[in-house]
Amino acid sequence: MAHPITITDANFTSEVLDSDVPVLIDFWATWCTPCKMIAPIVEDLTSEYEGRVKVGKVDVDANPVTPGMFGIMSIPTLMVFQGGKAADRIVGYQPKPALKARLDAVLATAR
């Protein structure tokens, strides 16, 4: 089973903006209850989209620069990056089918 990679302020550009494949990023914090609720869904998506989408997680407390660059004010916030640019932003808990639909919509534009 695949797991999300850890994204930091230091590796954000190389892992996300320079990625050859779309990247789903989960901005989260250890104290955030909705973040804990969405975490298993993000884990599932990592496996389901393996090879097509890179999935990563940014701890906003440990890495404040990256969330600040994108105006992250609420967590969880999930962002999809494609070609080095933000392609979608999802704020708050969403059920798995809703997240898959949003991710699939971005992937459809990549074809």
Place the predicted regions along the sequence by residue.
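Short pre-active-site segment immediately N-terminal to redox-active cysteine/selenocysteine motifs
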Residues: 20-21, 28-31, 74
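A short glycine-leucine-enriched loop at secondary-structure breakpoints
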Residues: 68-73
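Conserved redox-active cysteine motifs that mediate thiol-disulfide chemistry
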Residues: 27-41
